[in-house]
């Protein structure tokens, strides 16, 4: 009997908290200072936030001068120079933006954080991050499957095609959604991650995200994710359709409604779910990996 390995197996002793890991301030190319950015996210009910200025590390000590507004603030930055952009989340110090991105990934890991690749389908050629690099690098947590700012730039804000190609190759990677906010108006509240956090501290948020105990969203709320034998159930507040996909991004089931309960198809190597709401509201579960 195949085994379903997934990140939602122990949802006890914590609570779901929404947050964003990709945002900019006037320290790099953002239009607002740190406190204005923090205030905006807090006013929208976010539970955690990372300031990720380009190659400018924001430490936990740096945050002490600001009012966190009851949010958990996460150290990090966007590694930008010398190659495709990456998020550095939760490490204890600045990491040099080496052109060899594997070295960046390794240095972040050594310093207690995790890394992910940003907006892979940015630019007119949809290739900000060459796929060969995504395939060759090891030890990163995942990639942005949605990046809000790319909606108004060239390329696609979505990266699920890259995700599915990597998952189909057997990689175990998480999908993240972020604002990548820069502008003073219109860049916040586009994409976020909803993590099940047990320890409400920076370390606790980093642990939840690095272990994949979250879903990515642009507006759909997931209420329940459960595995029972060979069946997976997803229940939402506001999805109009839920689609189940397997390797190669092949759809094997869908339901027009807010919930779905499907049996894992024979021979599947992974399964994931996309929850479609109205307009541009989506939610994406993390993959369920099938081991024979």
Where are these regions (language model features)?
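A metal-dependent hydrolase metal-coordination microenvironment
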Residues: 2-120, 124-139, 145-165, 169, ...
């Amino acid at each position: 009997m195949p085994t379903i390995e997934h990140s939602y197996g122990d949802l006890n002793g914590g609570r779901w908290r929404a947050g964003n890991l990709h945002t900019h301030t006037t320290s790099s190319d953002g239009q607002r200072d740190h406190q204005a950015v923090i205030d905006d996210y807090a006013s929208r009910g976010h539970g955690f936030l990372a300031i990720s200025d380009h190659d400018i590390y924001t430490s936990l000590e740096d945050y002490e001068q600001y009012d966190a507004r009851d949010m958990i603030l996460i150290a990090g930055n966007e590694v930008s120079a010398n190659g495709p952009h990456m998020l550095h989340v939760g490490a204890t110090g600045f990491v040099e933006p080496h052109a060899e991105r594997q070295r960046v990934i390794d240095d972040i890991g050594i310093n207690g954080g995790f890394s992910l690749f940003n907006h892979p389908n940015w630019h007119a050629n949809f290739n900000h991050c060459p796929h060969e690099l995504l395939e060759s690098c090891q030890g990163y947590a995942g990639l942005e499957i949605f990046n809000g700012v790319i909606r108004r730039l060239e390329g696609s804000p979505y990266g699920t095609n890259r995700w599915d190609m990597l998952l189909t190759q057997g990689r175990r990677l998480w999908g993240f959604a972020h604002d990548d906010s820069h502008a003073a108006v219109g860049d916040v509240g586009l994409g976020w991650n909803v993590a099940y956090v047990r320890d409400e501290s920076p370390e606790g948020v980093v642990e939840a995200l690095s272990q994949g105990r979250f879903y990515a969203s642009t507006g759909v709320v997931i209420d329940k994710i459960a595995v029972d034998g060979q069946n997976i159930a997803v229940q939402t507040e506001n999805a109009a359709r839920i689609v189940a996909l397997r390797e190669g991004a092949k759809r094997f089931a869908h339901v027009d409604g807010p919930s779905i309960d499907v049996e894992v198809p024979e021979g599947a190597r992974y399964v994931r779910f996309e929850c479609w709401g109205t307009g541009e509201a989506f939610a994406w579960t993390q993959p369920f990996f099938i081991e024979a």
